[in-house]
Amino acid sequence: MTVIKTEPTTEVTLYSPPSKESLSKDDAHRKKQNNKPPSSINSRSGPNKHKLAAKAPEKKINNTDKQDLSAFLLNPSLIVKPSESKKKENIVAYNDTPGIKTEHTAFQPLTPISKKRALKEKAASEKCDSFDLSRDEKPYIQKKSKTLSSVTEINSSEYKLSLNGENTSSPAKEKSQEPIENPGSYQKTRNYLFEKPDPLDTCLQDYSSMLPSNVAEEDQEYFISVADSTLEEWTNKGQEIIDQQFQLYQEIIKKRIELSYKFKGIISVINDRADALEEQGQQLEGKIKKVKTLANEILNII
């Protein structure tokens, strides 16, 4: 029998199917080549034209990263509700560890898009709160309006009663308004307003009782005589006082005029003396100028 021996250098190669990663790389490379723009006809061929560009390192997305992203996007804490937008207008709660239910420990500022959405939801919720009333709240509001109307009626009735009570007179006033049984004899008015009253009518024996005790006797007599004077005596006395005042003014004016004439004589003497001194000064200045001119002429001659 013949035995077939294999050479030591030869190796048996087995077929192995290509991996998914290599297939995906080939597909991406083909797409890049197809998407490249065609080169211009008149372009010059450079030394580095046929060199291949270095490929950027592709980031591999693992299944775990996909799960983390899906869990982060599906996290219910990131969804802004209308009720929460009232309390937190510009903040959104987020968890440090996505995928695990924990309490809200921190807050993240809203983006411009989420701010607009939150404002829209807030306006909608306020409209709903203002216009939509439940069936249980409507009867409560009606009851409240009825109670308010009853309270206002009670207050108005109390106010009317208080006004009526104020209008009614007190018993003391009623007694004072009652007629007196024996008012006595009527006292007739015999004097005019400008006439002096009788001391007997005023229950006074003498006007001296109205004056203080510190007043001297002479002054008391004068005051009593003035009080006993009639209207004519008052007017005559006033005219006498006015005449005396006019005489005093005349005397004061005369004395001021005399003083002004005296001052005028004194002032005229002073003015004459001042004029004489000024003339003397001018004469001295003229002499000094003449001396200066003579001195300058002598210096020029020398």
UniProtKB/Swiss-Prot annotation:
InterPro entries: Ecm11_C
Gene Ontology, cellular component aspect: condensed nuclear chromosome; nucleus; synaptonemal complex
Lineage: superkingdom: Eukaryota
Keyword Nucleus: yes
Biased composition (Polar residues): 35-46, 162-171
Coiled-coil region(s): none
Record bears the keyword Nucleotide-binding: no
Subcellular location: Nucleus
Region (Disordered): 1-67, 162-187
Keyword line: Cell wall biogenesis/degradation, Nucleus
One GO process term, biological-process aspect: synaptonemal complex assembly
Predominant subcellular localization, coarse grouping: nucleus
Feature: compositional bias, Basic and acidic residues: 56-67
Role this protein plays: May be involved in cell wall organization and biogenesis.
Quaternary structure annotation from Swiss-Prot or TrEMBL: Interacts with CDC6.
Protein name (database record): Protein ECM11
Native organism taxonomy: Eukaryota, Fungi, Dikarya, Ascomycota, Saccharomycotina
